[in-house]
Amino acid sequence: MKVFLLNRSATLLLAAVVLMSCSENEQRLVEKGFERAAQQYELMYEATPLGMYPRTVNNSGETRLIGAEPLKSGANWTNGFYPGILWMLYAHTGDVQWKAKAEKVTRALEVQKNQIYHHDIGFIIMASFGKAYEYCPSEYYKNVIVHAAGSQLSRFSEITGTTKSWDQWTSRGGIYTTYYPVIIDNLMNLDLLFKAYELTGDEKFLKPALSHADKTMANHIREDGSAYHLVAYNPETGEVDARKTSQGFSDSSAWSRGQAWAIYGFTMCYRFTKKPEYLETAMKAADFFINHKNLPEDSIPYWDFNIGEFTDYEWAYDPERFEEEPRDASAAAATASALLELKSYVDDPAKAQQYRDAAVKMLSSLASPAYMAERGENNYYLLMHSVASVPHNSSIDKPETYADYYFLEALLKLKNDL
């Protein structure tokens, strides 16, 4: 009995040491990420005129800046991430200088509350005004959120039960056109509607959000948990007309960032509603991602999970174009952030730990020299090696503000879980 007790005590002590070591490593990971982010975004803030919002780097090597005004093209869907990054730097450091910077660039984006040209008002407002309200609640921020949610409702159809992403979409080869496209990314914009309902209690915001989430669950998610990128609806009957892709490899493939949006989006829907089917769908999508045979060893995915595996594509795919297919750091960052929330809703401790471990592995890879830029490099963005769209030849192997945003958001979640 004494020997057993000694062995048990030694085992418990060893476990405590291991846990402490893991916790210390994760604390260093958080501090490293935010220290470098502060260095980069101090320089970014100094270099960026007020009212302009960094998105990526042009092929010429110059920082691509987008104005605050709503655009029909949807090119400014990323505008909220820059102020959101500044808000998270304030949240982590408590430094009021970051708060002042965040307030300035957030207020300059208020014009977006009237954006009705595309679905991404949710991304724009919740990454900026949503973070502002989270860290510094005020009637001003609340009113902008609620007003913007009203603008988003203008794109909802009772017939399809969904919010229309764009007014028109044509496939890369010009073979197919739809006037009611809904992409998996759109799920993320429900955050705005759910928040407006939470702030007002007005069900005009809740019902469209629930309807869109339910339709996405039914029509975008495959049996294996992967997500179709684009579902085309018949605007007169509400029926599904086609399932396609815009940014993925093929109609049948799983676009990596689209998969991240599915995991994150259904996790967010569960947060607001506690509907078990949303949790089940989020887990199904997460399991597809983290267990996929084509996920690289460092857990940073290629831009699509099925490159070269299907033939239903309409773009000029050249298997010899890249020595190695581009990775998408933004997909890993968004997935890591989603997993660190998802794990808190899972009853099975082993499953929750699996999600946490997967997230930490992604974050550790992103914080390595292979993905995190040195101070003053990378046009002052934090992470390297993201992809906007290979089929569109758009921003391939470039930095993106949304990669930095979700990386820092994930680090804050990890910090709160230490």
Where are these predicted regions, by residue range?
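Bacterial N-terminal signal peptides that target proteins for export
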Residues: 1-11
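C-terminal motif of bacterial Sec signal peptides marking the signal peptidase cleavage site
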Residues: 20-21
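Glycan-recognition and catalytic cores of secretory/periplasmic carbohydrate-active enzymes
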Residues: 25-418
